[in-house]
Protein backbone atom coordinates (compact mmCIF):
# COMPACT_ATOMS: atom_id res chain seq x y z
CA UNK A 1 0.00 0.00 0.00
CA UNK A 2 1.44 3.37 -0.99
CA UNK A 3 1.77 6.38 1.27
CA UNK A 4 -1.09 8.08 -0.61
CA UNK A 5 -3.43 5.10 -0.12
CA UNK A 6 -2.54 4.91 3.58
CA UNK A 7 -3.30 8.63 3.94
CA UNK A 8 -6.70 8.18 2.28
CA UNK A 9 -7.47 5.20 4.56
CA UNK A 10 -6.39 7.18 7.64
CA UNK A 11 -8.65 10.09 6.65
CA UNK A 12 -11.59 7.74 6.11
CA UNK A 13 -11.01 6.06 9.47
CA UNK A 14 -10.75 9.44 11.21
CA UNK A 15 -14.04 10.53 9.62
CA UNK A 16 -15.79 7.30 10.62
CA UNK A 17 -14.60 7.60 14.24
CA UNK A 18 -15.32 11.32 14.74
CA UNK A 19 -17.96 12.83 12.45
CA UNK A 20 -19.90 9.81 11.22
CA UNK A 21 -21.33 8.88 14.66
CA UNK A 22 -22.60 12.46 15.08
CA UNK A 23 -24.22 12.60 11.64
CA UNK A 24 -25.53 9.03 11.55
CA UNK A 25 -25.99 6.73 8.56
CA UNK A 26 -27.87 8.88 6.09
CA UNK A 27 -26.28 7.95 2.78
CA UNK A 28 -28.79 6.73 0.22
CA UNK A 29 -26.22 4.86 -1.86
CA UNK A 30 -24.15 1.71 -1.62
CA UNK A 31 -21.20 2.00 -1.10
CA UNK A 32 -21.56 4.95 1.27
CA UNK A 33 -20.36 8.37 0.12
CA UNK A 34 -17.22 8.17 2.26
CA UNK A 35 -16.31 4.71 0.90
CA UNK A 36 -17.06 5.89 -2.66
CA UNK A 37 -14.82 8.94 -2.23
CA UNK A 38 -11.98 6.84 -0.77
CA UNK A 39 -12.19 4.38 -3.68
CA UNK A 40 -12.35 7.23 -6.23
CA UNK A 41 -9.31 8.90 -4.65
CA UNK A 42 -7.34 5.65 -4.79
CA UNK A 43 -8.37 4.79 -8.36
CA UNK A 44 -8.33 8.21 -10.00
CA UNK A 45 -5.91 10.28 -7.92
CA UNK A 46 -6.48 13.41 -5.84
CA UNK A 47 -7.94 15.77 -8.47
CA UNK A 48 -10.40 13.56 -10.34
CA UNK A 49 -11.12 11.50 -7.20
CA UNK A 50 -12.05 14.63 -5.24
CA UNK A 51 -14.26 15.80 -8.10
CA UNK A 52 -16.04 12.43 -8.28
CA UNK A 53 -16.51 12.40 -4.48
CA UNK A 54 -17.94 15.93 -4.47
CA UNK A 55 -20.35 15.06 -7.28
CA UNK A 56 -21.48 11.98 -5.36
CA UNK A 57 -22.06 13.95 -2.15
CA UNK A 58 -24.15 16.47 -4.12
CA UNK A 59 -26.28 13.59 -5.49
CA UNK A 60 -26.89 12.20 -1.99
CA UNK A 61 -30.21 13.89 -1.28
CA UNK A 62 -33.90 12.92 -1.38
CA UNK A 63 -34.17 13.95 -5.05
CA UNK A 64 -30.85 12.49 -6.22
CA UNK A 65 -31.67 8.80 -6.38
CA UNK A 66 -30.41 5.84 -4.37
CA UNK A 67 -29.10 2.31 -4.73
CA UNK A 68 -25.86 0.74 -5.90
CA UNK A 69 -23.52 3.35 -7.38
CA UNK A 70 -19.83 2.32 -7.54
CA UNK A 71 -17.08 4.70 -8.67
CA UNK A 72 -16.49 4.64 -12.43
CA UNK A 73 -13.67 2.40 -13.63
CA UNK A 74 -10.33 3.91 -14.42
CA UNK A 75 -10.06 4.89 -18.09
CA UNK A 76 -8.25 2.29 -20.14
CA UNK A 77 -6.22 3.42 -23.15
CA UNK A 78 -7.97 2.73 -26.42
CA UNK A 79 -6.62 -0.09 -28.55
CA UNK A 80 -6.20 0.55 -32.23
CA UNK A 81 -7.69 -1.89 -34.73
CA UNK A 82 -4.22 -2.83 -35.99
CA UNK A 83 -3.19 -3.92 -32.46
CA UNK A 84 -5.88 -6.59 -32.19
Curated annotation (Swiss-Prot):
UniProt function note: Could be involved in insertion of integral membrane proteins into the membrane.
UniProt-listed InterPro entries: Membr_insert_effic_factor_YidD
Superkingdom of the source species: Bacteria
Main location: membrane
Keywords: Cell inner membrane, Cell membrane, Membrane
Protein name in UniProt: Putative membrane protein insertion efficiency factor
Basic residues bias spans: 75-84
Family: Belongs to the UPF0161 family.
SMART domains: Haemolytic
Membrane-topology annotation of the record: Peripheral membrane protein
Region annotated Disordered, chain positions: 64-84
Pfam families, per the entry: YidD (PF01809)
Gene Ontology cellular component annotations, sorted alphabetically: plasma membrane
Places the protein is found: Cell inner membrane
Amino acid sequence: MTFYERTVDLGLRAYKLTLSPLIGRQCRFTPSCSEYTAAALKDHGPLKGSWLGLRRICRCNPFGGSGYDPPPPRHQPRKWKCEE
